[in-house]
């Protein structure tokens, strides 16, 4: 075998000190060179960056990555977003032209537009749905990658702007793991924000080189921003325009035809592509009148001090800002190190080298005249702004300030001031440059600084919402802002700006440190800064829960059932509707109830009728009108005090033949068919025993606990009648006897139940009037003294005219003594004054089944102690818990 030339053997000898390389060294070195070359290949290099951000995400959110099958931070909005992502996938391959006609809020149209459509969020995860992963698993994976991809987007923006890997890593870490992102974890669409930095990167790339390829990338990034989040798209419009103006000024491209022609073409095509995804929001606002009220926007608008309140998932700054007003709601603190690094950017700047100039001393006469007019406009706008703020939207001066609002006057003042400094700085401002345009073009600051400054400022102003005129003028001029409820989400742009400024600050610190201590290398400074940021942003161990990843039996049954209408699931409320939305991704049938950014009128009416009080039979008419095919009742979700109302309603509905009981699943989920819509639906088993109509007396026989809950008002009314008639608290035995007498034949939960109870209570008062003990107590008293005694028993101080009016009514025969007794017992002053005493006594009756001074107490010391506690705290739940945990109650239940 021929010997290799000496020149070719030299590298091997160099590696081994002039001796031949050992066996295996050459293949290892070649493998290393191959791996290094592969790592430099752009796709692999970018993938490695993403993987590093995935590693950081795993560390800062541990153990989230170990529970991707079913991890969610709460059972609210994550379930809603999971359904939206599933629907985007499902409808894309089933009927893409009707993407917005979702299977919720049936029978309304365009219901996907009731909230974010999240199509750009769901699109990258379509393969996971295709592989058969559960919707909640896909959501968990997307949540994890949202951190990593957002960081990667900011990394790219920082690298493109500065050409520095160190700046890029700092910017990526800040943007990926800022505490506010953890605060938004319930709303994945706002956590997933890689397109925000990427659209600004595309703008920078296109500004620097106006090629067709970069124009296409700008249009695509703009399109994906709108495709992912309508809110972020709306928020991006202003900073994109301002950053574009900054870059055009710095690069002198205002008259560059290629820039305008190609950018207009790219953005127009992107906007055209977004029309099918934006038009439904306009149609929804017109069809259903959906619009965010100003009060909603105000309630979600922060104040500057809320930037010192931190998300509680952050382990280092936990609890910071909790005590300030609104601190528990607004969590905007970006972290200490990003602020310190930003200060380094602002303060550690190279000194001015150009000589200072004052004003525009050599300006042309025409420019001086323009400046004089601008100064006059500024003075005028300032004066008008003062008046507009003071008289904002009032009728003074003929309603002038209903048109010249504070935000419009302040916007005019701001525009005039910006125009003034762009032409020339005022003489009292000493600067190296004649005007702001020259300052902007100065090489003293780079593109990254100006873009970071713009983004930080605009994002900060967004967070203030209605508390600052900037957002109000956006609300007036940009219709899309009227559909957004939470202005603080716009603060994400501030964090992107701070990420860039922090990266520049670390670079400047590295320059200063290495200049003073040459032995410290620049990469070391970047590594230390990144480690400090990761330590500050740490959220591990992250608190989360295991979500309902698999469907229950009734959901699987609905999936296999053909139906002509929709499904109503009860109880319907914000606490449960998110879960129903998640399950609708499993059965894929039309759902009438649900939750979203806006809700349907039908859903709100159903929720109103079933949330409190008697469930009216009018609900059946609504179900038939919609039409609903099936009603599912989640019995385990119904609070105990509401179960009788539900049982009564469904008993009457089944008895009337308008609902048909089909079956019970998992021992607690009942399925009913709406007979008018599904006449062929058959009953598979007999209705459960609890659907049998029962009166209040039988419920009290079963458990005295039925004195409380939804029957508390009845029990308190009987208590007050007894107190006024006898001047003392009732004893357990007599009270239960009277309650059973009242409740015999009285069916709770019906629309006529309260009227029936009132009639029975009046009959009881008339019966008492005939009793010997009543006559013995009151028979010898005249009408005036009788009325006075009733008020004395009640403990209510009635004025003389009130007592005289009631006594005169008795004397004239217009009122009976039983009627007077009822009137005093129903006095609102008695109801309020004796509320705590009555409720506490009812707890003794319901839980312990005895009077307060019966054994083992023998006196009222225990009663008086708990009464003082209740009057001090007004915490009835605490009292109920104390009775439930008492040894006496537990022994009784055994």
Question: Language-model features: where?
Answer:
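Composition-driven recognition of low-complexity segments enriched
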Residues: 621, 689-894
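Membrane-interface coil-to-helix junctions
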Residues: 56-150, 178-193, 300-323, 466-471, ...
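Perimembrane helix-loop-helix junctions
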Residues: 39, 236-271, 349-360, 421, ...
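Membrane-helix boundary/interfacial segments in multi-pass membrane proteins
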Residues: 183-190, 300-303, 320-330, 394-409, ...
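Extracytoplasmic
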Residues: 531-699
């Amino acid at each position: 075998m021929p010997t290799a030339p000496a020149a070719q053997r030299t590298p091997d000898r160099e590696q081994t000190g002039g001796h031949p390389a050992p066996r295996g060294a050459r293949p290892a070195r070649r493998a290393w060179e191959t791996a290094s070359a592969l790592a430099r290949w752009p796709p692999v290099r970018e993938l490695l960056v993403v993987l590093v951000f995935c590693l950081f995400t795993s560390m800062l959110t541990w153990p989230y990555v170990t529970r991707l099958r079913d991890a969610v931070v709460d059972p609210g909005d994550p379930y809603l977003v999971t359904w939206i992502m599933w629907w985007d996938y499902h409808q894309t391959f089933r009927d893409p032209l009707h993407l917005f006609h979702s299977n919720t809020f049936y029978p309304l149209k365009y219901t996907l537009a009731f909230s974010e459509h999240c199509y750009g969020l769901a699109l990258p995860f379509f393969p996971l749905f295709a592989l058969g992963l559960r919707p909640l698993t896909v959501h968990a994976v997307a949540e994890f990658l949202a951190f990593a991809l957002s960081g990667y987007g900011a990394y790219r923006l920082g690298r493109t702007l500065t050409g520095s890997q160190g700046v890029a890593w700092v910017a990526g870490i800040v943007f990926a793991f800022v505490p506010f992102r953890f605060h938004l974890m319930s709303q994945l669409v706002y956590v997933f924000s890689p397109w925000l930095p990427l659209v600004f990167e595309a703008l920078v790339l296109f500004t620097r080189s106006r090629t067709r390829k970069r124009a296409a990338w700008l249009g695509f990034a703009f399109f994906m921003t709108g495709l992912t989040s309508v809110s972020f798209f709306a928020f991006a419009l202003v900073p994109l325009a301002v950053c574009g103006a900054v870059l055009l000024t710095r690069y002198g491209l205002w008259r560059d035809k290629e820039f305008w022609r190609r950018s207009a073409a790219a953005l127009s095509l992107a906007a055209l592509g977004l029309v099918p995804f934006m038009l439904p929001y306009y149609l929804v606002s017109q069809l259903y009148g959906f619009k965010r009220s100003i009060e909603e926007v105000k309630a979600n608008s922060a104040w500057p001090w809320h930037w010192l309140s931190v998300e509680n998932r952050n382990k280092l700054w936990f609890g910071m800002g909790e005590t300030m007003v609104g601190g528990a709601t607004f969590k905007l603190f970006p972290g200490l190190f990003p602020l310190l690094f930003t200060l380094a950017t602002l303060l550690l700047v190279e000194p001015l080298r150009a000589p200072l100039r004052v004003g525009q001393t050599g300006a042309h006469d025409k420019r001086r005249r323009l400046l004089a007019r601008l100064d006059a406009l500024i003075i005028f706008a300032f004066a008008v702004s003062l008046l507009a703020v003071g008289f904002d939207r009032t009728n003074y001066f003929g309603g002038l300030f209903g048109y010249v609002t504070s935000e419009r006057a302040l916007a005019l003042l701001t525009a005039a001031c910006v125009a003034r400094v762009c032409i020339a700085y005022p003489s009292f401002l000493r600067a190296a440059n004649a005007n702001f345009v020259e300052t902007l073009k100065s090489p003293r600051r780079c593109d990254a600084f100006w873009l970071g400054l713009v983004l930080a400022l605009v994002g900060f102003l967004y967070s203030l919402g209605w508390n600052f005129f900037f957002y109000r003028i956006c609300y007036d001029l940009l219709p899309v802002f009227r559909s957004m409820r939470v202005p603080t989400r716009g603060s994400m742009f501030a964090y992107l700006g701070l990420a860039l400024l922090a990266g520049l600050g670390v670079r400047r610190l590295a320059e200063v440190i290495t200049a003073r201590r040459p032995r410290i290398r620049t990469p070391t400074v970047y590594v230390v800064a990144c480690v400090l940021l990761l330590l500050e942003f740490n959220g591990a161990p992250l608190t989360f829960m295991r979500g309902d990843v698999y469907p229950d039996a009734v959901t699987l049954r609905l999936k296999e059932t053909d139906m002509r209408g929709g499904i109503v699931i009860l109880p319907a409320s914000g606490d449960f509707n998110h879960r129903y939305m998640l399950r609708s991704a499993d059965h894929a049938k039309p759902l009438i109830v649900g939750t979203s950014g806006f809700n349907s009128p039908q859903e709100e009416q159903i929720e109103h009728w079933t949330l409190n009080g008697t469930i009216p039979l009018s609900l059946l008419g609504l179900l038939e009108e919609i039409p609903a095919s099936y009603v599912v009742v989640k019995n385990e979700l119904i609070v105990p005090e509401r179960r009788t109302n539900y049982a009564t309603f469904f008993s009457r509905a089944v008895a009337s033949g308008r609902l048909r009981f089909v079956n019970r699943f998992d021992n607690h989920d009942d399925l009913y068919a709406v007979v008018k819509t599904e006449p062929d639906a058959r009953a598979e088993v007999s209705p459960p025993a609890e659907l049998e109509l029962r009166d209040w007396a039988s419920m009290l026989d079963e458990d005295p606990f039925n004195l409380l809950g939804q029957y508390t008002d009845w029990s308190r009314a009987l208590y007050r009648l007894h107190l006024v008639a006898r001047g003392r608290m009732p004893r357990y035995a007599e009270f239960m006897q009277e309650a059973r007498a009242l409740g015999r034949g009285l069916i709770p939960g019906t629309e006529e139940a309260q009227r029936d109870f009132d009639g029975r209570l009046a009959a009881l008062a008339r019966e008492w009037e005939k009793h010997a003990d009543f006559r013995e107590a009151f028979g010898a008293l005249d009408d005036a003294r009788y009325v006075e005694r009733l008020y004395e028993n009640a403990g209510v101080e009635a004025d003389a005219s009130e007592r005289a009016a009631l006594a005169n009514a008795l004397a004239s025969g217009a009122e009976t003594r039983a009627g007077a007794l009822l009137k005093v017992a129903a006095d609102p002053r008695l109801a309020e004054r004796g509320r705590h005493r009555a409720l506490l006594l009812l707890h003794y009756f319901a839980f312990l089944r005895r009077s307060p001074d019966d054994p083992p107490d023998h006196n009222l010391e225990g009663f008086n102690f708990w009464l003082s506690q209740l009057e001090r705290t007004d915490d009835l739940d605490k009292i109920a818990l104390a009775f439930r945990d008492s040894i006496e109650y537990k022994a009784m239940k055994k």
